[in-house]
């Protein structure tokens, strides 16, 4: 104990210990709580722009289910999954909006996304003020249990579930909740 006290009085040792503790805390925060990401493409314009830096809450979906409209950061290849959409590297992440929930049918008609209870029955049009035109018709596409249908807000410029199908919940990294850079765009959503 005496040796520890003497070492702590040394400013160099104190600095090293402080940096080590700070590094360990930052590592744990990124691993379990909040992780920063950079928006890789224009598929979420005008909500998120290319190069925006965002924070995603990693812990949130351990306590609650993803909700329609959430902006989610996820692995497009579902690291470890056998059904991998697209030909993406394991380190690649996508940022998209959750549109379709498990056991729903998703389609677009006349430029508007619709959620249906059956293949073409019980359909309702989503109110999507964030979506940029053009929106081509597609579907209906079934969202299996434990899966989510993801789309970019910039519908004419987005590689999303229309191209590679729904994602598994296990592919989710976290829900994006804040733009922290550039400073002029700091905002919560």
Model region roles, listed by residue range:
Residues 1-13, 17, 28, 32-38, ...:
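Soluble "head" domains of membrane/secretory-pathway proteins
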């Amino acid at each position: 104990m005496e040796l520890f006290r003497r070492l702590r009085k040394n400013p160099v040792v104190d600095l090293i210990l402080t940096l080590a503790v700070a590094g360990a805390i930052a590592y744990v925060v990124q691993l379990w709580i909040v992780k920063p990401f950079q928006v890789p493409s224009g598929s979420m314009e005008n909500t998120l722009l290319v190069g925006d830096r965002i924070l995603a809450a990693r812990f949130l979906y351990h306590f609650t289910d993803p909700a329609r409209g959430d902006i989610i950061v996820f692995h497009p290849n579902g690291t470890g999954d056998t059904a991998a959409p697209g030909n993406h590297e394991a380190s690649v992440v996508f940022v998209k909006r959750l549109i379709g929930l498990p056991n729903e049918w998703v389609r677009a008609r006349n430029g508007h996304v619709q959620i249906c209870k059956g293949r073409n029955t019980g359909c309702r049009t989503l109110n999507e003020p964030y979506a940029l035109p053009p929106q081509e018709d597609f579907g209906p596409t079934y969202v299996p249990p434990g899966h989510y249908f993801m789309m970019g807000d910039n519908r004419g410029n987005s590689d999303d579930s229309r191209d590679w199908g729904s994602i598994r919940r296990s592919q989710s990294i976290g829900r994006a909740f804040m733009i922290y850079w550039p400073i002029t765009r700091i905002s919560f959503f």
